[in-house]
Amino acid sequence: MGKKRKVTLLDFAFTDKEPRPIPRIPYYWMTDEELQSIHKFPYMNGERCPFEFSVRVGEEVYKFNGVIPKGFPWNVADIPFLLQPISYDKHSPFVVQGSLIHDYLLSRKRVLYNDWEMEAKGITPLEFKRITSEIFGYVLRYNGVPYRKAWLMAKFVDLFQYFIPTWYSLNVKEFDLG
């Protein structure tokens, strides 16, 4: 029996500017569709944010980079009701950056997975989802969340993705992600 190959996140960083979340404000003249979009995605990214991260696959290390576009909408974080008492408020500055990069990577999964040639590097789609959860936890720790709480929140995100795997792809249809 061969050795099991392990996929591990090594590091993550915003390389130029950090995200600047801007609340999307509903106005009386907006259409019902625009108001529903704001209700679903109450924030948008106010800065163009380049990022990079490294992943170890077995013995190989791969670097990936991308850019979160200015104006990218996201819902901050869906924290199930029962888990809210042991996690941060979804609008907490500790959570916002991590949820942005996580939601961006998942919304672009099909494109990024192919652009970054992840399959050729031996990373499966399920491992890519797990990497996005690890990045979420990594950014939480970077922003000062204690290790155990960040780990726990990242595990919640991972479980949520496992049970509702298509959530983000079903909800981000109105924003042209290129």
Language-model features, listed with the residues they occupy:
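Extended terminal accessory/targeting regions
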Residues: 2-178
